[in-house]
Amino acid sequence: MSQIHTRLEVMSELAKNMDTYVKDYLVPIETNWQPADMLPDATKDSFFADVKALQEAANELPYDYWAVLVGDTITEEALPTYESWLLGMDTVNHIDQNDGWARWIRTWTAEENRHGNLLGTYLYLSGKVDMKAVAVSTQYLIADGFDIGTSADPYRNFVYTSFQELATNISHRRTASLAKQHGNSLLSRMCAQIAADELRHHKAYRAFVSEIFNLDPNEMMLAFADMMKKKIVMPAHFLREINGAKSSLFEHFSDAAQRLGVYTTQDYVTIMRGLISDWNIENMTGLNETAEKARDYVANLPARLEKLADRVKVPELAYPFSWIA
């Protein structure tokens, strides 16, 4: 296909395939799972016994696990930030109900919305969490927004989502495994279901970038390199507790994830290597001089970051989160 050189043309070209994208990467609402499928049913006589069993299983989970689970939940609950960010992309007409990209974003958001609902209800029922403290951190995170370096550029936005959806998949997948190791099959199932959603979403955004590379390889390469230079910032990087400064809590949350092995600096490098391979960056030809330099920069970056990852030291002592009762 001939190369297209404007964002509007490229995004319009991709939007022609929106029916296929929605069919391949999102699940029809009628057949999708819902939080109620996994939570105790308050209409049943067994409700109180089921909640008691849930709480007994929750008692077996270690402190850092709760810190990570709450942080993951708050991240999911900050969905309004992510939806408004995507709807604010250049080339997206969110007023037009027939706009292909607005349709994708709304349908993706509808799937993502279940994650925070499920985890938040589990936290409430567990009896292990100060839900007011969690709600305060959630409200702060939504009010503070985020600063991830993409501006309103769809190319940079899709690099970010390709990376971040896979990082989220890894985190939820490993919390599922750890819950299972501690005998909590219910929570393991919840986290695994969320992880599966995140993997589908990752594959979608990865496919969008692949298509953009076919249509506008020079500009897409520059966008990829720019995001790698800036580093992918986690969406909860402004995390804080009541009366805390913006971003004051994120490092403690990240340290807990590192101690558990849920998401590590090595995972960051592994994801980058995977995207470089998936998009065939090292073998891409026909680029202009500037894009070639960007390609070479990206191709050499994982080896450099690997050395830094090996030197990362994580504090051994857990931080006293206000979230955990």
Model-identified regions with their sequence ranges:
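Non-heme di-metal
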Residues: 1-325
